[in-house]
Amino acid sequence: MPLMAELEKARDYGDIFSLVKKVVKRSLSLHRVGLMLYLGNLPLTVGAFHPLGTNDLVLNRRLLKSKTGLGHKSHVFAILLHEYLHSLGLTDERQVRRLTYKLCLDNFGRQSPVVEATLTGPWVNLSEEDFDELEPELDLELVRNFEHIEGGYII
């Protein structure tokens, strides 16, 4: 099944992340397991982050709330891909941004909404007023069944 069709079929963060891992393994021959996803109320200028040395990915709930459809899935894919690359040990932000774009371009094609998401980010539809909010409480929420692991793995 083509990757775009798989993304369209994705039901949740775990399905999208499985696709992220497939792209990275196929393109870079890199792979890791045991990651956990948290949704948090981050400042609107932050899409997500991976605390180095952890198994955690933290996604900004505020940027993605109330969004649906393929555009939403494309942004989630691009953000999770970016943070997954960090979790694999790539720490240079510019290098990771370029690699995120290249992987999306190579795997989805130039006209894909996933490639567009790597260029615009989830901030494209925000207004100036959205950025004027006070800093929120982080309020982390663990996303259950995020990583689909084939075979056994002990956390």
Predicted regions and their residues:
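Residue-level marker of regulatory loop/turn positions in helix-turn-helix DNA-binding domains and
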Residues: 69, 73
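Active-site recognition of the HExxH zinc-binding catalytic motif
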Residues: 74-90, 97
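A generic structural motif
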Residues: 63-65, 84-85
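Metalloprotease/metallohydrolase-associated module, dominated by Zn2+-dependent proteases
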Residues: 1-58, 65-67, 91-155
